[in-house]
Swiss-Prot record:
Participates in tumor necrosis factor-alpha (TNF)-induced cell death. May be a target of Wnt/beta-catenin signaling in the liver. Belongs to the BRI3 family. Interacts with BRI3BP. Interacts with MGAT1 and IFITM3. It comes from Cavia porcellus (Guinea pig). It is found in: Lysosome membrane; Cytoplasm, Perinuclear region. One of its GO terms (cellular component) is perinuclear region of cytoplasm. This is Membrane protein BRI3.
Length: 125
């Protein structure tokens, strides 16, 4: 395979002055979008008696509850030690019923679970 350059001629120079290239611009304004005419004046309604506006009453009641800025709420936090996060654990009876009564036993298993704090060891049903 020959390693010849693909381009035999040099590219044209880029120092063309304005209006000398192939795409010279025509007269100024040629091809420009014409400006839009001014909009027509609004029609005025002339009536002898002004129409009364309906009365609008707006009654707003807003209840604002402010919480202290320093409180941090932990969902699932232990109410005894306030440090640990409660974990779900299944009772022996719940696991036994899940095995014996297979499809419906899972309902018993989830109904008989305990929540336990790993920090203080407190259990909640």
């Amino acid at each position: 395979m020959d390693h010849k350059p693909l381009l035999q001629e040099r590219p044209p120079a880029y120092n063309l002055e304005a209006g000398q290239g192939d795409y010279a611009c025509g007269a100024p304004g040629y091809g420009a979008i014409p400006s839009a005419p001014p909009p027509p004046p609004y029609p005025y309604l002339v009536t002898g008696i002004p129409t009364p506006h309906p009365r609008v009453y707006s009654i707003h009641s807003r209840t604002v509850t402010r919480y202290p800025a320093n409180s941090i709420v932990v969902v699932g936090g232990c109410p005894v030690c306030r440090v640990g996060v409660l974990e779900d654990c299944f009772t022996f009876l719940g696991i036994f019923l899940a095995i014996i009564l297979f499809p419906f036993g899972f309902i018993c298993c989830f109904a008989l679970r305990k929540r336990r704090c790993p920090n203080c060891g407190a259990t909640f049903t």
